Amino acid sequence: MFRGASAINLDAKGRLAIPTRYRPEILEQNQGQLVCTVDIRQPCLLLYPLSEWEMIEQKLLSLANFDPALRSLQRVMLGYATECALDGAGRILLSEPLRQRAKLEKNIMLVGQLNKFEIWSESEWNAQIEQDMVLGSSSEFALSDALKTLSL
């Protein structure tokens, strides 16, 4: 399970070092294999262990592609999906199209979301968190049906 937010740097070649606390799980359960794609709703990337991505892929493939919205989702998520392998130093290489799509430069955030990571530019992450905090204190957030049943 991937938890927490880590501020990390992309090197000049577009590589990022996965924090050491996550590496054993990625290596043991997925032989260091990950898949990165874009988030269709947010300006970030989604980084899945290969086994998690294979489940997402099956869900995407099972959708009827006659629906233009579903076809767009498939096109974007599958079209950008790129396999990334941990190298000997625990780094992965993010392709140029992925980096451009998420506006990634040197300072980035790797954010654990239990079964996957989100990869954000640091500035986009800070803006999103600020927006989420404002929403969290609003009455709209409290009125969500799904949140009414959530016990933390």
Curated annotation (Swiss-Prot):
Coiled coil: none annotated. Keywords: Cytoplasm, DNA-binding, Repeat, Transcription, Transcription regulation. Residues 5-52, 81-124 form the SpoVT-AbrB domain. One of its GO terms (biological process) is negative regulation of DNA-templated transcription initiation. InterPro entries: MraZ, MraZ_C, MraZ_dom, MraZ_N, MraZ_sf, SpoVT-AbrB_dom, SpoVT-AbrB_sf. GO terms for cellular component: cytoplasm; nucleoid. CDD domains: MraZ_C, MraZ_N. GO terms for molecular function: DNA-binding transcription factor activity; transcription cis-regulatory region binding. SUPFAM superfamilies: AbrB/MazE/MraZ-like. It is found in: Cytoplasm, Nucleoid. Forms oligomers. Belongs to the MraZ family. This is Transcriptional regulator MraZ. It comes from Actinobacillus succinogenes (strain ATCC 55618 / DSM 22257 / CCUG 43843 / 130Z).
